[in-house]
Amino acid sequence: MFSDKMILIAGPCVIEEEETTLEIASKIQEIVAPYTDHIHWIFKSSYDKANRSSINSYRGPGLQEGLRILSKVKQTFGVEILTDVHSPEEARAAAEVCDILQIPAFLCRQTDLLVAAAETHAVINIKKGQFLSPWDMQGPVDKVLSTGNSKIILTERGCSFGYNNLVSDMRSIAVLSKMGFPVVFDGTHSVQLPGGLKTHSGGQTEFIPTLTRAALAAGAHGLFIETHMNPAIAKSDAASMLSLKTFEALLPIWNQLYQCVRSFEMAAV
């Protein structure tokens, strides 16, 4: 599905203004350009963050306007688009624009959503719930496969570890890989402190370099990275997003590590 290239799902957490979204997409494309022989970039952003901690938090522009902006990103930069969906109706609408439909971690066991998304024939990225073991992901996978759609990505984004904390178990990469689909590591949501700031989630971005390197060394097929020009003023997940400057600095490291691991795997075959 993605050949041997490293999958890089990258973009802002939520769609803000059209101009901001296009600016971020343009900068990511510029950063990724030297690595297109080795990296498969997919732009991601959400039209609705339906599970914000507070009723007063910004959720996004909504389905119709959000898809219009994502369509403009797709047309302007020629990049594949990923967004998350929350209902069968949203899945069918989003598939008209997006190449990859993401099942949010909190909804990863919702049968009707999984089946409806899969029936659009889009690629389905299932994020492993913070409450599930990696072995439990076979259930959501089977629900997608029941439709005849085998275009699946599995994303590890950490497990609940007491109150307001997550931990990343790198054994999960190996377990999920045995299911036969590309496994992506979410390097930004994995450092969240869910609800840790009362009205919104906190984060420990200083651990993103360590965890992303560990995931690639463990055999992950790619990374999911939310990034922004200035995370401090971002309208969602400000505490866990990576600045574009840091994203640019880490990309060559990720690329080299991915290529190194793949070369060892090929030599072992």
UniProtKB/Swiss-Prot annotation:
Transmembrane segments: none annotated. Its EC number is 2.5.1.55. It is found in: Cytoplasm. Its main location: cytoplasm. Keywords: Cytoplasm, Lipopolysaccharide biosynthesis, Transferase. One of its GO terms (molecular function) is 3-deoxy-8-phosphooctulonate synthase activity. Gene3D superfamilies: Aldolase class I. HAMAP family: KDO8P_synth. This is 2-dehydro-3-deoxyphosphooctonate aldolase. It comes from Chlamydophila psittaci (strain ATCC VR-125 / 6BC).
